[in-house]
């Protein structure tokens, strides 16, 4: 990348806008299973860039509703695919961003809540769908979706919190499940789940200190962050690590200047978008987490983003906080 480093806002907006015009590309159809997630990533990036109107609200809402899986009572990534917790959260986030949760209607909302709660297991963990994959991503996904819907209960929250705490490791990180390797994305899902449950006080001061050190040690000499020791830096960890540090009040433990430079070097200055590392191909996933990371660092008057929900603070400020009064 040549010249002085700056965020190419307009190019990123045009890049995101162009993604749905590439239906002639084979890659477009290979990513069907990520379509609803991709719309959430794109919309959130546009919100951070202060350009949510780039997407046509009515068209997005219509597509979200077309992904409803009536057999299981939740949202799939694409019409006629199977429902999953991850895509259900994306659907709820999109509708909440547009202040359109009421389009669900009473019956669909009841079924949606039942689907989410029904994926919780006896140990407090959640499976993503009926096929049974279990890890801390789905605990966060379930609690986040229920929180946005205002439907958290102690029967769901308390065992979920117990499971998350069992995933804390001796090195200050969190794993996919108890005794699994620490990973930055799991730090976010676990800390995010505890924050949504209003249970961060279940972590001792010493544990919070250890978590902070493990997270800030993810920064490498070139400025980028990795997900675990001995791995390459990746722009997406600008979100997973920074949001986790923000949740525990240690955001300034990262060198902002170096991380900002790393993210900006990952931009495609011709077509827009952000990649995982400099000179690699861009995608909407790394674009949203790149601009979200910059927002957390207060860069260039970007729209403030909530580190717990990865949604604009102007949206999350309306959510009911658990425990409900």
UniProtKB/Swiss-Prot annotation:
Function according to Swiss-Prot or TrEMBL: Catalyzes the transfer of a geranyl-geranyl moiety from geranyl-geranyl pyrophosphate to proteins having the C-terminal -XCC or -XCXC, where both cysteines may become modified. Acts on YPT1 and SEC4.
EC number(s) reported in the record: 2.5.1.60
Note from the entry: Present with 1520 molecules/cell in log phase SD medium.
A GO BP entry: protein targeting to membrane
Homology family: Belongs to the protein prenyltransferase subunit beta family.
Tagged with keyword Hydrolase: no
Keyword terms, alphabetized: Metal-binding, Prenyltransferase, Repeat, Transferase, Zinc
Cofactor note: Binds 1 zinc ion per subunit.
GO molecular function: Rab geranylgeranyltransferase activity; small GTPase binding; zinc ion binding
Subunit note: Heterodimer of an alpha and a beta subunit.
Catalyzed chemical reaction(s): geranylgeranyl diphosphate + L-cysteinyl-[protein] = S-geranylgeranyl-L-cysteinyl-[protein] + diphosphate
Identification of the protein by name: Geranylgeranyl transferase type-2 subunit beta
Ranges of the PFTB repeats in the UniProt entry: 9-50, 57-99, 109-150, 157-198, 208-249, 256-298
Binding site for geranylgeranyl diphosphate: 183-185, 228-240
Cofactors named for this entry: Zn(2+)
Binding residue positions for Zn(2+): 234, 236, 286
Entry's Gene Ontology cellular component terms: cytosol; Rab-protein geranylgeranyltransferase complex
Domain of life: Eukaryota
């Amino acid at each position: 990348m040549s010249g002085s480093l700056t965020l190419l806002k307009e190019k990123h907006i045009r890049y995101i806008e162009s993604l749905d015009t590439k239906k002639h590309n084979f890659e477009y159809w290979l990513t069907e299973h990520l379509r609803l997630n991709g719309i959430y990533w794109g919309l959130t990036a546009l919100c951070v860039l202060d350009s949510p109107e780039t997407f046509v609200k009515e068209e997005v809402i219509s597509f979200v509703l077309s992904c409803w899986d009536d057999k299981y009572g939740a949202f799939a990534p694409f019409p006629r695919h199977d429902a999953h917790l991850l895509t259900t959260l994306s659907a709820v986030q999109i509708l909440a961003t547009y202040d359109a949760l009421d389009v669900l209607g009473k019956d669909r909302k009841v079924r949606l809540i039942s689907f989410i709660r029904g994926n919780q297991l006896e140990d407090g963990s959640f499976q993503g769908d009926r096929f049974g994959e279990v890890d801390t991503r789905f605990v966060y996904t379930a609690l986040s979706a229920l929180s946005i819907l205002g439907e958290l209960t102690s029967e769901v929250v308390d065992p979920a919190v117990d499971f998350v705490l069992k995933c804390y490791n001796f090195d200050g990180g969190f794993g996919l499940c108890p005794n699994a390797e620490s990973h930055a994305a799991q730090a976010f899902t676990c800390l995010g789940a505890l924050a949504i449950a209003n249970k961060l006080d279940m972590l001792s001061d010493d544990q919070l200190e250890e978590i902070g050190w493990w997270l800030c040690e993810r920064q490498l000499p070139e400025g980028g962050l990795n997900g675990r020791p001995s791995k390459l830096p990746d722009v997406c960890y600008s979100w997973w690590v920074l949001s986790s540090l923000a949740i525990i009040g240690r955001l300034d433990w990262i060198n902002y200047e170096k991380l900002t430079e790393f993210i900006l070097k990952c931009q495609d200055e011709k077509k827009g978008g952000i990649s995982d590392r400099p000179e690699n191909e861009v995608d909407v996933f790394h674009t949203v987490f790149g601009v979200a990371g910059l927002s957390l660092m207060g860069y260039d008057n970007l729209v403030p983003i909530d580190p717990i929900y990865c949604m604009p603070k102007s949206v999350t400020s309306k959510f009911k906080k658990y425990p409900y009064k």
